[in-house]
Amino acid sequence: MLVLSRKKNESIMIGDTIEIKIISIDGDQIKLGIDAPRNLDVYRKEIFDAIQEENRLAMKSQSDWASMKQLFQTSKEKRDDQ
């Protein structure tokens, strides 16, 4: 991890298109300004983690639905054979 020190109104660049600027410092809280291309999603870490968890749960649900569908098809085939 790269660790940098910056003061108010100073910034860092990530690549050619992303600028992160220190807007204000108030005690232990720092306000950042992020200038990035619109096609790049920018999230707070806790929001990003929540989105990832929801995606994992959705994938599990899709897998569960596929298993349930197979179960019902097998059951229907058995009834049709009788």
Swiss-Prot record:
This is Translational regulator CsrA. Belongs to the CsrA/RsmA family. A translational regulator that binds mRNA to regulate translation initiation and/or mRNA stability. Usually binds in the 5'-UTR at or near the Shine-Dalgarno sequence preventing ribosome-binding, thus repressing translation. Its main target seems to be the major flagellin gene, while its function is anatagonized by FliW. Keywords: Bacterial flagellum biogenesis, Cytoplasm, Repressor, RNA-binding, Translation regulation. GO terms for molecular function: mRNA 5'-UTR binding. GO terms for cellular component: cytosol. Signal peptide: none annotated. Homodimer; the beta-strands of each monomer intercalate to form a hydrophobic core, while the alpha-helices form wings that extend away from the core. Pfam families: CsrA (PF02599). It comes from the Bacteria. The keyword ATP-binding does not apply. It comes from Brevibacillus brevis (strain 47 / JCM 6285 / NBRC 100599). GO terms for biological process: bacterial-type flagellum organization; mRNA catabolic process; negative regulation of translational initiation; regulation of bacterial-type flagellum assembly; regulation of carbohydrate metabolic process. It is found in: Cytoplasm.
